[in-house]
């Protein structure tokens, strides 16, 4: 056992995960720029590239915040990684179908609103206030779940097996 509470251990893991999600957004940007040069696309410009860097890094962080409740819940149970992965995938997949006002409310698509994602379309309007509130609510739920006390697991009494003494020598 570790001489640290589960809550502190979880908080440390969540902080490291937040930093990693931001960093992986930067890594995604780097791969995008490298792919741009490998494919030989024209029109690379520094200002849009820097805007893309900021957007991709923040998108990684905001998506982490939207998934925070799922991460906290699945961290409480042994062997629940796959369940958390499936739930997070479905949660993100449903976000592709959000449009209109729902687009600013649904947390996964609200992350796109906070980075001002346009998908190449003109006239895309995001309600940034709703986007911010949506992600803030998910973050608050995740933090609140961290402080909810976990039910103690029922432990079965270990039965000791007595071996019969060997006969003979």
Give residue spans per PLM region.
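Short helix-to-coil transition segments within interhelical loops
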Residues: 1-6
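Secretory targeting signals
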Residues: 11-74, 118
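Transmembrane helix-loop junctions in multipass membrane proteins, especially transporters and channels
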Residues: 29, 33-45, 79-83, 100, ...
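Residue-level signature of transmembrane alpha-helical entry/exit and packing/kink sites
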Residues: 51-59, 63, 80, 84, ...
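Functionally important transmembrane alpha-helices
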Residues: 65-96
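Terminal transmembrane helical anchor/hairpin motif
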Residues: 85-166
